[in-house]
Amino acid sequence: MNLILLLVIGFLVFIGTYMILSINLIRIVIGISIYTHAGNLIIMSMGTYGSSRSEPLITGGNQLFVDPLLQAIVLTAIVIGFGMTAFLLVLVYRTYKVTKEDEIEGLRGEDDAK
């Protein structure tokens, strides 16, 4: 299970990097969003799923236990990532409406084009 999760995280980081290195602004926003999903998976993988610890209040059981603090952190990170993605999409939309450009090369001024 951990190997599959590691491969998924690596694939998400690879795809996010590929998208961020693009010149299209929408792809850059999608790449940043994919990075946040990879970060959430990294945080979730730090949980103690599969260890021999049991729940803190039940003393007679031998059931598996997942740390709820990491789940709360990931839930908060999902909300923050959603807000950041929404803000970046509005920023790209407004930039497109003002400049009629959706690529980074077109946003450079006349002085920067040299």
Curated annotation (Swiss-Prot):
The keyword Transmembrane applies. The chain crosses the membrane at residues 3-23, 28-48, 72-92. Keywords: Antiport, Cell membrane, Ion transport, Membrane, Transmembrane, Transmembrane helix, Transport. It is found in: Cell membrane. GO terms for biological process: monoatomic ion transport. It is a multi-pass membrane protein. InterPro entries: CPA3_antiporter_subunitC (IPR050601), NUOK/Mnh_C1-like (IPR039428). The keyword tRNA processing does not apply. GO terms for molecular function: antiporter activity. One of its GO terms (cellular component) is plasma membrane. May form a heterooligomeric complex that consists of seven subunits: mnhA2, mnhB2, mnhC2, mnhD2, mnhE2, mnhF2 and mnhG2. Expression of the mnh2 operon in E.coli is not able to catalyze Na(+)Li(+)/H(+) antiport. It does however confer higher growth rates than the control strain at up to pH 9.5. The operon may encode an NADH-ubiquinone oxidoreductase. Belongs to the CPA3 antiporters (TC 2.A.63) subunit C family. This is Putative antiporter subunit mnhC2. The gene is mnhc2.
